[in-house]
Amino acid sequence: YCFDSLPEKECFFQYIKSDKVQEVYFTEMFTSNQGDLSVYYYDPESGRIWQYYPDFLAKMKDGTYQLIEVKGDNKIDDVVVQAKKEAALEMAAASGIKYEMYAGSTIMKTHILESLPVQQTNLLP
């Protein structure tokens, strides 16, 4: 799998190393309509409906699911990103799934599932 960014890679490794997570699935790799996990959203800039593929889907050990998106700090407030987030939140709520959008800086500073600071020795190259 080719990660889009270091924070996305760090997020993935935090999820697979966590004892709270049973499995993690890549969803973004199915961007050529090969997978079923996508979110339709209204793009306020183009006025069109598009498909959005979140980064990961995690099955937690408590039986719940999390749909996960990692965004750079400079993009997280973008109107299109927010439109994707709103559509994903609506779809996730209707499906009983929790949607998480993480800022890259948050992932690099915090063990997101543990709410603990990341130690410099644990950062990925």
Give residue ranges: language-model regions.
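Electrostatic, structured charged patches in enzyme active sites and in nucleic-acid/phosphate-binding
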Residues: 1-125
